[in-house]
Amino acid sequence: MPLLRKYEIMILLTEEFNDSELKTWVFNYAKNLRKFSVCDISVISRGKHNLAYPIETKMKGNYIQLNFSSMPKYITNFSKTLKMDSNVLRFLVFNKQL
């Protein structure tokens, strides 16, 4: 059985999303994660907040938290997908297992 590790990704999206568009974006990204045999996906919307400093001239952003289990070799693929998305201002991947 392959070694699964628990990860958390915090994603900062542009503020242009309304609630339904945000849900659609998250659903599509979660569907993309499932292609890599990701399991135990949970999504938490942290809401829209003011940024401490402008990022690409944006002053607000939507925060999304994704928790899931995956094989370590796929994390690079997830990161590349997020880097190519123009709606993503920043993201950070945490390994939740010590």
UniProtKB/Swiss-Prot annotation:
GO terms for molecular function: small ribosomal subunit rRNA binding; structural constituent of ribosome. Gene3D superfamilies: 3.30.70.60. Its main location: plastid. The keyword Magnesium does not apply. Pfam families: Ribosomal_S6. The keyword Ribonucleoprotein applies. Keywords: Chloroplast, Plastid, Ribonucleoprotein, Ribosomal protein, RNA-binding, rRNA-binding. It comes from the Eukaryota. It is found in: Plastid, Chloroplast. HAMAP family: Ribosomal_bS6 (MF_00360). Binds together with bS18 to 16S ribosomal RNA. This is Small ribosomal subunit protein bS6c. It comes from Phaeodactylum tricornutum (strain CCAP 1055/1).
